[in-house]
């Protein structure tokens, strides 16, 4: 930003006197269809890739930044710490408000009961995903550490198993993916709404998913439905089971269940 001089002249001295903004002040007339073609797709891809949808490791960037921060804090083996402490550290990778970061943590916690296999071992009131009346307590009152299952998220992460990139201000680095040892994207449900695209994956039983993956690696013609019967939800429940419908969902990746 321009700074006023200290010599009392009132003139503005700029930090970068040789810098300029290309085409500044020039009004460009073009068809709106051309503008959309040039700008909409890059914007959509940025939202899809960088923010809204889970990657192949099953995590959105906000989840990954939070869990990696907790890993670097030693919360995989150490004792619990205040949630507010984790939220503050996470801002080094995720420059959002503390409320958004804490809400992400709540969803990943055992106390909230959102995930089939929670990633955050929590202590205190984290609310319940199935009740709007049971709100979670403020971050200064709750405590967290990583759940033991996170050992499978970070296994060999310090051995160049995944790529690392600089954070937003180049003060540190963060992983682009987690080297997970099981298909987290199938085990823990994750929803995402992007630009003209959305993702909603049901959670499946961990043992069945691993059994199916091993069988499929050994035999690409393996009948998936013989080992992966259907979704497994954290709150339990009954499903109107239609084998042919499930097969079609497995084949296409599209469909719904009741």
Give names to the regions the model predicted.
Residues 1-254:
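Catalytic phosphate-handling regions of large nucleic-acid enzymes and associated NTPases
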Residues 256-258:
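Gly/Lys-enriched N-terminal cap/neck module of very large, oligomeric protein machines
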């Amino acid at each position: 930003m321009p700074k006023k001089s200290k010599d009392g002249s009132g003139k503005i001295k700029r930090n970068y006197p040789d810098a300029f903004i290309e085409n500044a002040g020039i009004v460009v007339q073009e068809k709106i269809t051309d503008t959309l073609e040039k700008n909409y797709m890059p914007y959509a891809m940025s939202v899809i890739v960088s923010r809204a949808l889970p990657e192949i490791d099953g995590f959105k960037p906000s989840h990954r930044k939070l869990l990696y921060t907790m890993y670097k804090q030693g919360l995989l083996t150490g004792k619990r710490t205040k949630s507010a402490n984790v939220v503050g550290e996470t801002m080094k990778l995720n420059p959002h408000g503390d409320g958004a970061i804490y809400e992400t943590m709540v969803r990943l916690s055992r106390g909230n009961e959102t995930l089939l296999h929670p990633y955050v071992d929590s202590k205190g009131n984290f609310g319940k995903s199935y009740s709007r009346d049971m709100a979670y307590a403020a971050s200064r009152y709750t405590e967290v550490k990583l759940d033991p299952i996170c050992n499978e998220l970070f296994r060999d992460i310090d051995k160049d198993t995944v790529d690392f990139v600089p954070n937003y201000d180049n003060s540190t680095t963060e992983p682009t993916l987690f080297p997970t040892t099981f298909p987290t994207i199938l085990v823990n449900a994750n929803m995402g709404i992007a630009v003209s695209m959305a993702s909603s994956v049901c959670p499946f039983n961990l043992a069945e998913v691993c059994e199916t993956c091993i069988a499929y690696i050994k035999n690409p013609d393996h009948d998936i439905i013989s080992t992966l019967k259907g979704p497994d939800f954290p709150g339990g429940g009954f499903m109107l089971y239609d084998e042919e419908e499930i097969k079609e969902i497995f084949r296409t990746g599209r469909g719904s269940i009741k």
